């Protein structure tokens, strides 16, 4: 068997050879296989079988009639879902009841509402290949089973990482939407309960009247019946007595005569038959006529129906109390604060008997204000089938104002979380880092990036009223003293003059301070007064000023009410809010002389008195002047009168002509000119209460700019009410002589989501414009140097579109002067003033406004030593030459960038390096360093290796950081004599 040919050794030649290993190759466990790249796939995209075109938001409900069903998608279904099965997915996310509650139903003894907290869950659907963040909530409907309508909000995406990474932010924003929907639903649910209670009260009155009518009718019909029965019984008794007497009289003859017995028996039987026949006839008559002898409806049924109605009234009152006592929860975000529901009536026990005038009773009898007037209806005790009723839609379940706010918030959420998960995560990291760089992040970062939730805000200081909605009642109503509150909520305080022990209480409001000085149009709203062109005379205004001052000295108070009218901190906390609420209905401005007369008032010594249940004012000063209390009144920014502005322009022009002859040393303005500019540019903001204008002097820069931005945003929402002066340069700090034109627009006045660079799309647009500018002008680096060194750049042209396009491109390189305002004027045709150069660093100027359009305008030629001029029509640039190296990468004509977003991000990275160097230059003084030579400062060592032009850039950025750190605005125009060159294509 050993030598058998069937046994063959199965071996290879390589089995016994040595295996060679390459030392340069990675081990197999560390090697990464190559990515199977295809044309449509990318390494960072996850291949998914989802049928979605993009992420969307789905609103679904579990209907008691048809089951789970989709209600709404954001954006529309045709744009987002594609072939995605919404019905199946709604069944998937609503298959579990996350809002289980113990709410009672009409079958139980009493109704009870349990306000359940929202539930949040992340679901994955393997069939559709999608993931969803699902937010469950409960709305209330009077016609629904158990009064509940289960709903859910779902953010549907094919990227699981996006849902997990952004879970916290998505949850926070959906909480806002849910709170908005539930607040509006509680408002509508309370209104429905009011209507139901009115109908029940009306039904109870009708039933009581019907019950009284039926009882009276039945009692009147019962009397003849009883009378007939009694007369019949009397006749029967008489017949019996007669028969008895006849029977006794015939006893003796009967004994005597036995023959007459048979005849007497016959008479007796005949009488019995007659009485029986009469009984039958009477019973037959009662059966033939039942309607005349019985009631229309049994009283027991009426009593039962009335008892059930009264029980329903008590149950619905209990429901209404539960809804109205539920506290409106305030979110921690200051931007989201829904207004409280209107005050509901305290009692529904109204005397309807005196108001009953017929079968139908109007709702005007009731003194409710929450629901519109409608005709009362009688409620039928026999309810119809539940499936015959039509359930309310989502829009009908919520108040219109809150519903539109929720939709606006949902669209904002969809726009914010649109895009790749890596981009969202990087954006979130950058925002967290920028939040810690408050000393430098204002220079080049967009203000939208500095917000925690960009694009997710309903409003800046309060909820912004959509243009397609009417103003709520609390905004459209007249201003009253009760609508203001301070750091102590709803606490009026009594102020008395120092010399008197008692103060006379004036029973008046802010709108009607004095009956004697009240104008004829006092009953009308300020908007109507302004539209009709009626102007209050100066004497009336003077009386109003005195009345307002007296009103502030002696406030409305009672023995048990306390109210804080104003403290030193009240203007900072309430200024922006009162601006938004009252900027749309301010009265026409009065003359400046009258306003100034009202300002020339010294500090009035006052003394506070406290009753047994009063509270001391939270104020540290010894006396309160009317200027300190004006912050409690609604105010709006008003400009100075044209006469005063003209005088200031003339004086400023005279000072400029004289100061042109002065000598400038080392790039600084002389002391006289600086003092004149500072005196001339003293800040002045006009604050307008509802009745007359008053001036509030020495306002801090931050408060004034915030108030300005709020007022201007409100004005931009309604262009029909915009006046040319509302967009003038008086909004910029320390500038009262600048040009006033209706063509001026301010990026700082626009909402945050409308500024340049506020969104990805806008950033891409700005980046593409910058790339086009670099390729169109090879000398673009010199223009960028002018912007980064603090030299004002003017884009001159005859076509507004071309000028605005270049201004948009150059805005990428412009450092912001402060955090609170921008320094860009995209288009103007008014001659420039010296103060404009202090506030604006990038200006678009109209060439056609000059007498000779072919030449340089006179104002630009006059200030040419301070300006760099880019002529769009002639393709020339007049500016100093840049020879440094810090910004060469920023403006490279041969750059290979193709996408605007990519270049915008690259420009921000280069600018961040400049900001880092400027930060070190600003805050590195005095620190010992081993490489620093003896006797040299840190600034000299830091700038020793830089070019002169680069030093100018860093010094300018360092100066801006210093001013921002000290919270001071640039108030001196710094420049230096340098040679300028003309670059031409």
Curated annotation (Swiss-Prot):
Keywords: Autophagy, Cytoplasm, Guanine-nucleotide releasing factor, Nucleus. Residues 242-292 have a biased composition (Basic and acidic residues). Its main location: cytoplasm. GO terms for biological process: autophagy; negative regulation of autophagosome assembly; negative regulation of gene expression; negative regulation of macroautophagy; positive regulation of autophagosome maturation; positive regulation of TOR signaling; regulation of autophagy; regulation of TORC1 signaling. GO terms for cellular component: cytoplasm; guanyl-nucleotide exchange factor complex; nucleus. GO terms for molecular function: GTPase activator activity; guanyl-nucleotide exchange factor activity; protein kinase inhibitor activity. Residues 242-301, 502-528, 639-659 are annotated as: Disordered. Residues 390-895 form the cDENN FLCN/SMCR8-type domain. Residues 904-962 form the dDENN FLCN/SMCR8-type domain. Disulfide bonds: none annotated. Residues 502-514 have a biased composition (Polar residues). It is found in: Cytoplasm; Nucleus. Residues 47-225 form the uDENN FLCN/SMCR8-type domain. Belongs to the SMCR8 family. This is Guanine nucleotide exchange protein smcr8b.
């Amino acid at each position: 068997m050993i030598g058998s040919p069937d046994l063959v050794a199965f071996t290879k030649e390589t089995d016994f050879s040595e295996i060679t290993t390459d030392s340069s190759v990675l081990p197999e466990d560390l090697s990464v296989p190559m990515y199977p790249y295809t044309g449509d796939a990318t390494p960072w995209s996850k291949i998914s079988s989802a049928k979605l075109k993009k992420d969307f938001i789905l609103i679904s409900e579990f209907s008691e009639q048809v089951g789970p069903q989709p209600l709404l998608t954001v954006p529309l279904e045709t744009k987002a879902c594609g072939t995605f099965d919404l019905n199946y997915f709604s069944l998937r996310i609503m298959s579990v009841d996350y809002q289980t509650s113990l709410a009672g139903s009409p079958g139980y003894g009493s109704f009870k509402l349990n306000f359940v907290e929202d539930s949040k869950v992340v679901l994955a659907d393997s069939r559709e290949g999608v993931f969803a963040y699902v937010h469950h909530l409960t709305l209330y409907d009077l016609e629904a089973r158990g009064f509940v309508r289960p709903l859910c909000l779902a953010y549907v995406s094919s990227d699981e990482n996006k849902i997990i990474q952004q879970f916290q932010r998505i949850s926070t924003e959906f909480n806002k939407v849910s709170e908005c929907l539930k607040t509006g639903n509680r408002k509508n649910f309370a209104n429905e309960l009011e209507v139901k209670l009115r109908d029940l009260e009306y039904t109870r009155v009708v039933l009581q009247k019907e019950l009284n009518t039926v009882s009276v009718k039945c009692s009147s019909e019962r009397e003849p019946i009883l009378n007939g029965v009694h007369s019949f019984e009397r006749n029967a008794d008489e017949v019996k007595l007669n028969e008895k007497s006849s029977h006794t009289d015939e006893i003796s003859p009967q004994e005597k005569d036995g023959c007459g017995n048979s005849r007497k028996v016959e008479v007796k039987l005949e009488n019995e038959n007659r009485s029986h026949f009469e009984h039958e006839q009477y019973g037959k008559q009662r059966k033939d006529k039942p309607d005349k002898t019985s009631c229309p409806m049994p009283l027991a049924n009426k009593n039962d129906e009335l008892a059930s109605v009264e029980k329903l009234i008590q149950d619905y009152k209990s429901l209404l109390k539960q809804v109205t006592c539920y506290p409106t929860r305030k979110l921690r975000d200051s931007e989201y604060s829904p207004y409280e529901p209107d005050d509901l009536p305290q009692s529904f026990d109204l005397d309807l008997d005196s108001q009953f005038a017929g079968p139908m009773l109007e709702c005007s009898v009731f003194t409710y204000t929450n629901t519109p007037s409608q005709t009362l209806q009688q409620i039928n005790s026999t309810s119809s089938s539940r499936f015959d009723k039509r359930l309310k839609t989502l829009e009908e379940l919520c108040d219109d104002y809150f519903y539109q706010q929720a939709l606006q918030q949902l669209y904002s959420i969809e726009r914010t979380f649109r895009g790749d998960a890596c981009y969202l995560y990087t954006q979130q990291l950058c925002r967290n880092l920028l939040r810690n760089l408050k000393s430098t992040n204002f220079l080049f970062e967009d203000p939208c990036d500095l917000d925690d939730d960009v694009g997710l805000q309903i409003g800046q200081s309060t909820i912004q009223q959509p243009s397609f909605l009417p103003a709520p009642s609390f905004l459209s109503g007249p201003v009253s003293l009760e609508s203001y509150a301070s750091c102590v909520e709803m606490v009026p305080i009594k102020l008395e003059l120092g010399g008197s022990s008692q103060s006379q209480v004036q029973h008046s409001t802010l709108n009607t301070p004095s009956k004697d000085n009240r104008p004829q149009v006092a009953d009308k709203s300020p908007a109507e007064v302004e539209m009709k062109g009626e102007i209050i005379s100066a004497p009336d205004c003077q009386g109003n000023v005195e009345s307002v001052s007296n009103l502030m000295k002696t406030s409305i108070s009672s023995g048990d009410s306390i109210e804080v009218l104003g403290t030193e901190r009240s203007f900072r906390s309430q200024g922006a809010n009162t601006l938004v609420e009252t900027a749309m209905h301010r009265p026409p401005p009065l003359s400046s002389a009258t306003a100034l007369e009202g300002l020339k008032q010294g500090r009035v010594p006052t003394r506070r008195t406290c009753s047994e249940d009063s509270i001391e004012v939270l104020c540290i000063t010894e006396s309160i002047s009317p200027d300190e209390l004006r912050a409690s009144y609604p105010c709006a920014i008003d400009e100075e009168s044209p006469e005063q502005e003209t005088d200031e322009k003339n004086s400023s022009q005279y000072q400029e002509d004289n100061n042109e002859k002065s000598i400038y040393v080392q790039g600084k303005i002389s002391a006289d000119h600086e003092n004149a500019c500072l005196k001339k540019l003293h800040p002045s903001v006009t604050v307008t209460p509802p009745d007359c204008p008053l001036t509030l002097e020495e306002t801090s820069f931050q408060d004034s700019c915030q108030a300005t931005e709020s007022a201007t945003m409100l004005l931009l929402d309604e262009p029909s009410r915009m006046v040319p002066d509302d967009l003038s340069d008086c909004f910029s700090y320390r500038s009262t002589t600048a040009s006033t034109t209706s063509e001026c627009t301010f990026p700082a006045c626009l909402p945050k989501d409308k500024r340049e660079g506020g969104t990805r799309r806008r950033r891409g647009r700005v980046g593409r414009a910058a790339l086009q500018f670099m390729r169109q002008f090879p000398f673009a680096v010199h223009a960028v140097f002018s912007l980064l060194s603090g030299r004002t750049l003017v884009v001159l042209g005859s076509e507004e579109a071309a000028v605005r396009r270049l201004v948009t491109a150059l805005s990428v390189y412009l450092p912001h002067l402060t955090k609170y305002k921008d320094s860009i004027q995209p288009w103007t045709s008014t001659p420039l003033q010296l103060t404009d150069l202090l506030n604006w660093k990038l200006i678009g100027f109209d060439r056609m406004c000059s007498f000779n359009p072919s030449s340089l305008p006179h104002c630009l030629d006059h200030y040419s030593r301070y300006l760099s001029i880019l002529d769009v029509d002639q393709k020339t640039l007049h500016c100093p030459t840049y020879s440094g190296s810090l910004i060469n990468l920023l403006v490279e004509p041969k750059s290979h960038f193709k996408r605007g977003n990519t270049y915008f991000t690259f420009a921000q990275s280069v600018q961040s390096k400049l900001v880092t160097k400027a930060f070190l230059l600003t805050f590195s003084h005095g620190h010992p360093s081993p490489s620093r030579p003896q006797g040299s400062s840190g600034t000299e060592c830091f700038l020793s290796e830089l070019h002169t032009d680069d030093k100018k850039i860093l010094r300018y950025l360092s100066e801006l950081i210093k001013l921002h750190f000290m919270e001071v605005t640039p108030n001196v125009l710094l420049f230096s004599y340098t040679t300028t060159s003309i670059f031409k294509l």
